[in-house]
Amino acid sequence: MYRVFRLPANQAAKADLLLQDDLVSRQSVVVRDAKSLGIGGDDRYVLVEGIDAAIARASELLKDGGKALTGTEAERVYHSFRSQDEDAVSGMGMIFGP
């Protein structure tokens, strides 16, 4: 399970709360600026992948400043995260060979 959150630029430091929380920090937590994902604006996006309890905890930690994305917007941003990961893996393969 995953959830994507959007944090306005003035709330970007709240992403650190996820990395400091015992439960959430044990999951996959990826933080990216909007521009690095090819999305306009100065927002910061956070992808949390893991167990349901950790996703719920992340939602609770970010409720005062972050917005959990839903529907096509969440899917679009999630795809941007995955595309970056795939590009990185592809680049490593070109460096080290098959």
Question: Where do the language-model regions lie?
Answer:
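Conserved short beta-strand edge segments in small beta-sheet-based binding/regulatory domains
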Residues: 28-32, 64-83
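Short, low-order "capping/linker" segments at domain edges
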Residues: 78-98
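Short, flexible, solvent-exposed loop/turn segments with mixed acidic/basic and small polar residues
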Residues: 1, 29-41
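Short amphipathic alpha-helix segments
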Residues: 7-34
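Short amphipathic alpha-helices in soluble, non-transmembrane regions
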Residues: 16-23, 56-67
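Long, non-globular segments of proteins
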Residues: 1-2, 13-17, 81-88
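Helix N-cap motif at beta-to-alpha junctions
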Residues: 8-12, 49-56
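Long, compositionally biased, intrinsically disordered regions
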Residues: 3-14, 68-72
